Design a protein with these regions (language model features):
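Surface loop/turn motifs at the tips and blade-to-blade linkers of beta-strand repeat domains
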Residues: 28-34, 69-74, 108-113, 153-157, ...
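A broadly used, surface-exposed interaction patch
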Residues: 60-89
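Short glycine/acidic-enriched loop and turn motifs that connect beta-strands
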Residues: 94, 133-134, 225-228
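A short alpha->loop->secondary-structure connector
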Residues: 100-112, 144-149, 189-196
Length: 237
């Protein structure tokens, strides 16, 4: 069944269902040379979209015109978050920040930056996980380019490594290879995040970029010590 999806027919029909065609697609623009590594729509300001195509970062306006903003490293998927004024790109391990008001695009070169695999935004901070570790960092308040060397914490409830962080309902879900923790903004310094007591389960994430938010829930491709390949949706913690 390629490009088809099943539709149920109400009781009384000649058959119980049929295969409906998927909506058609219209080519709007070709951005860069590809592959497309990340897409983002601004959360609070303007109607522009942003895309990482190959090693280039573009802004796309409402007429689908693309403006080159800069160059990024790596070849894999790019995790993106924005604060309303800055857009943070985690390219694993490098990271970049675009400031819309000044139209500046810079690589994060703070000497205390240890690399970013995925990123999210909560309460004025960009939070990101250090690659191949249990460590979560936050940037300085309202500045994605600056890092305090003490602004980090570790997901230590289990020995698995953190693979992704996702902000949901003003909480940060910390996905490990086989477990998941939920943290909140405890307003502590220099690292403001802390685990919520009891918000822990023994299901991790197999694929960081399978994580999606929909209907106030998080969906992801799960993994635990017994196996992997099940799609989960959270209900509470």
């Amino acid at each position: 069944m390629i490009n088809l999806f099943p539709e149920a027919i109400p009781e009384g029909g000649m058959t119980s269902g049929f295969l409906n065609r998927a909506p058609g697609l219209r080519l709007l623009a070709t951005i860069g040379t590809g592959p497309i590594r990340g897409l983002w729509t601004h959360q609070t300001a303007g109607n522009d979209a942003y895309v990482v195509s190959g090693n280039k970062f573009y802004k796309i306006d409402t007429s689908y015109n693309a403006t080159l903003l800069g160059t990024v490293s790596g070849t894999g998927p790019v995790s993106i978050a924005d604060s309303g004024t800055q857009i943070f790109l985690a390219c694993n391990p490098d990271a970049y920040v675009y400031t819309e008001s000044t139209n500046t695009f810079v690589k994060v070169t703070d000497p205390d930056f240890a690399g970013a695999a995925t990123v999210c935004y909560i309460d004025g901070y960009f939070a990101f996980n250090q690659p191949n570790s249990q460590i979560i960092w936050v940037t300085e308040l309202l500045d994605g380019t600056a890092i305090n060397p003490l602004a980090f914490g570790a997901a230590e409830s289990s020995p698995d490594q953190v693979v992704a962080v996702v902000a949901n309902n003003r909480e940060v879900w910390v996905f490990g290879q086989g477990t998941t923790e939920v943290w909140y903004d405890a307003a502590t310094t220099p690292f403001p995040l802390a685990p919520i007591q009891g918000a822990y389960n023994e299901i991790g994430c197999l694929a960081p970029f399978s994580i999606a938010k929909l209907d106030n829930s998080i969906f992801w491709l799960g993994s635990d010590p017994r196996g992997y390949g099940i799609v989960y949706r959270n209900q509470g913690y």
